[in-house]
């Protein structure tokens, strides 16, 4: 029997990737629904009109009276729940929901649920590869890649889901087999009233979870859990009885579980302490669902990282170049600066700037002073970053990513690394962080 009551009317609000997945899901179940989007020409409009010409669609300013016709509004993550039209419809009886809530109702296989301010995609991808190496029929997606509803299949044995705070806002009960908040730092402060509201949204991932994984070194990642709920931990310190961490023997560091060394850190192909933390988090999540260590460690040895996430580009004149364009918040940039900075013999030349989304950049000052030779700044909020850094290092302003690559190459010395880790979104200058990363990679390739 369908878990959706068929005589109720629904509206999908937002026609991007997740909105279109909702359209397919509802249409396949014969549910009555319409579509609304604040944009005059949303990305999937042509697809909707071609494949579902019978579905009513309203584009432009949201019509409250139209929304109030619905018993339930499936709100895409790109639209804030605080939008007045949504709040008015909700006050008049419409339930606000989303695609992840529907996914949770229909998923028959265990779910590994992953969120955090940073490293979500890397850890999600790693766990998915570990599960595949263990012979599991695994589906990976959510905020990363394939929308959640498009993954639903009776053939799937395990779901590995990356979830954003925006998706979790409309998720009442996820019921994951294991859930984690990898870390929390300020992000999306242009959408949330402050860090507490952002923290609460992230922690909705733990609702109904059967096990949790906690970052020992980030108190904000730890949920309030009842007695008896299994809790596994990870961190860059020595592991506890239920934990994964680092051990050192004869000058060599090892990934470890409890009192057992699992593999030398030197066997990882990805560099930096932050990537060691990602590996430990993935091990903890995989262990929670019973993945064997041999398959997980084999996956770790082969993993080369994701594009735009502290991605090594090339070496030139003794200087390594890294593309960390995905670092769209301060926490992500800090992870890269500290992770790479502690792992190289020289200094970093940092390239940062863009749309800061209302963030506080003051946390960058100390690690930049410790690990960086200079900072090259660009984008809308370059001056805000400059004010936060003060006299920590020499500051250079440029107008383009190409100029940033050229100036950084001039500043870097043999043994250094040039790191694009903007601590900002890209929308002031680019379509998305991927385009920013590609432009940087091309500029680095063109250095004479």
Swiss-Prot record:
<dbReference type="Pfam" id="PF02875">
    <property type="entry name" value="Mur_ligase_C"/>
</dbReference>
<keyword id="KW-0132">Cell division</keyword>
<keyword id="KW-0961">Cell wall biogenesis/degradation</keyword>
<dbReference type="GO" id="GO:0071555">
    <property type="term" value="P:cell wall organization"/>
</dbReference>
<dbReference type="Pfam" id="PF08245">
    <property type="entry name" value="Mur_ligase_M"/>
</dbReference>
<dbReference type="GO" id="GO:0008764">
    <property type="term" value="F:UDP-N-acetylmuramoylalanine-D-glutamate ligase activity"/>
</dbReference>
<comment type="function">
    <text>Cell wall formation. Catalyzes the addition of glutamate to the nucleotide precursor UDP-N-acetylmuramoyl-L-alanine (UMA).</text>
</comment>
<keyword id="KW-0133">Cell shape</keyword>
<keyword id="KW-0573">Peptidoglycan synthesis</keyword>
<comment type="pathway">
    <text>Cell wall biogenesis; peptidoglycan biosynthesis.</text>
</comment>
<dbReference type="GO" id="GO:0005524">
    <property type="term" value="F:ATP binding"/>
</dbReference>
<dbReference type="Pfam" id="PF21799">
    <property type="entry name" value="MurD-like_N"/>
</dbReference>
<dbReference type="GO" id="GO:0005737">
    <property type="term" value="C:cytoplasm"/>
</dbReference>
<dbReference type="GO" id="GO:0008360">
    <property type="term" value="P:regulation of cell shape"/>
</dbReference>
<dbReference type="InterPro" id="IPR036615">
    <property type="entry name" value="Mur_ligase_C_dom_sf"/>
</dbReference>
<keyword id="KW-0547">Nucleotide-binding</keyword>
<protein>
    <recommendedName>
        <fullName>UDP-N-acetylmuramoylalanine--D-glutamate ligase</fullName>
        <ecNumber>6.3.2.9</ecNumber>
    </recommendedName>
</protein>
<feature type="binding site">
    <location>
        <begin position="116"/>
        <end position="122"/>
    </location>
    <ligand>
        <name>ATP</name>
    </ligand>
</feature>
<comment type="similarity">
    <text>Belongs to the MurCDEF family.</text>
</comment>
<dbReference type="InterPro" id="IPR013221">
    <property type="entry name" value="Mur_ligase_cen"/>
</dbReference>
<dbReference type="InterPro" id="IPR004101">
    <property type="entry name" value="Mur_ligase_C"/>
</dbReference>
<dbReference type="GO" id="GO:0009252">
    <property type="term" value="P:peptidoglycan biosynthetic process"/>
</dbReference>
<keyword id="KW-0131">Cell cycle</keyword>
<dbReference type="InterPro" id="IPR005762">
    <property type="entry name" value="MurD"/>
</dbReference>
<keyword id="KW-0067">ATP-binding</keyword>
<keyword id="KW-0963">Cytoplasm</keyword>
<keyword id="KW-0436">Ligase</keyword>
<dbReference type="InterPro" id="IPR036565">
    <property type="entry name" value="Mur-like_cat_sf"/>
</dbReference>
<dbReference type="GO" id="GO:0051301">
    <property type="term" value="P:cell division"/>
</dbReference>
């Amino acid at each position: 029997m369908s878990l959706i009551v068929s005589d109720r009317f629904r509206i999908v609000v937002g026609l991007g990737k997740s909105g279109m997945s909702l359209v397919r899901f509802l249409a396949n179940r014969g549910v009555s629904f319409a579509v609304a989007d604040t944009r005059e020409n949303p990305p999937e409009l042509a697809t909707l009109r071609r494949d579902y010409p019978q579905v009513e669609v309203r584009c432009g300013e949201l019509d409250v009276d139209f929304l109030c016709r619905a018993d339930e509004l499936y709100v895409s993550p790109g639209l804030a729940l605080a939008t007045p039209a949504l709040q008015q419809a909700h006050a008049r009886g419409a339930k606000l929901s989303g695609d992840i809530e529907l996914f949770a109702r229909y998923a028959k296989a265990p779910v590994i649920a992953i969120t955090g301010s940073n490293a979500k995609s890397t850890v999600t991808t790693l766990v998915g590869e570990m599960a595949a190496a263990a012979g599991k029929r695994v589906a990976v997606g959510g905020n990363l890649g394939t929308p959640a509803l498009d993954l639903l299949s009776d053939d799937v044995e395990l779901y590995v889901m990356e979830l954003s705070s925006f998706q979790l806002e409309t998720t009442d009960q996820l019921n994951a087999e294991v859930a984690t908040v990898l870390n929390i730092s300020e992000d999306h402060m242009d959408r949330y009233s402050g860090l507490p509201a952002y923290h609460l949204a992230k922690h909705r991932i733990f609702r109904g979870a059967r096990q949790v994984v906690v970052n020992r070194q980030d108190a904000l990642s730890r949920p309030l859990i009842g007695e008896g709920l299994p809790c596994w931990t990870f961190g860059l310190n020595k592991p506890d009885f239920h934990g994964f961490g680092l051990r050192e023997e004869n000058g060599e560091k090892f990934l470890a579980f409890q009192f057992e060394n699992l593999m030398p850190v030197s066997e990882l192909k990805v560099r930096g302490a932050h990537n060691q933390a990602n590996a430990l988090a993935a091990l903890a999540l995989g262990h929670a669902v019973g993945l064997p260590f041999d398959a997980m460690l084999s996956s770790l040895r082969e993993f080369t990282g994701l594009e735009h996430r502290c991605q090594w580009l090339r070496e030139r004149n003794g200087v390594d170049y890294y593309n960390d364009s995905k670092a769209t918040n301060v926490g992500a940039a800090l992870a890269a600066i500290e992770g790479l900075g502690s792992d190289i013999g020289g200094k970093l030349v940092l390239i940062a700037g863009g749309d800061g989304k209302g963030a506080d950049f003051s946390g960058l000052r100390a690690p930049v002073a410790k690990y960086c030779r200079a900072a090259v700044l660009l984008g809308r909020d370059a001056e805000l970053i400059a004010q936060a850094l003060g006299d920590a290092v020499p500051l250079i302003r440029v107008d383009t990513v190409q100029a940033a690559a050229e100036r950084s190459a001039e500043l870097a010395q043999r043994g250094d690394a040039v790191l694009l880790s903007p601590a900002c979104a890209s929308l002031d200058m680019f379509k998305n962080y991927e385009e920013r990363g590609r432009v940087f990679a091309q500029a680095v390739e063109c250095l004479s």
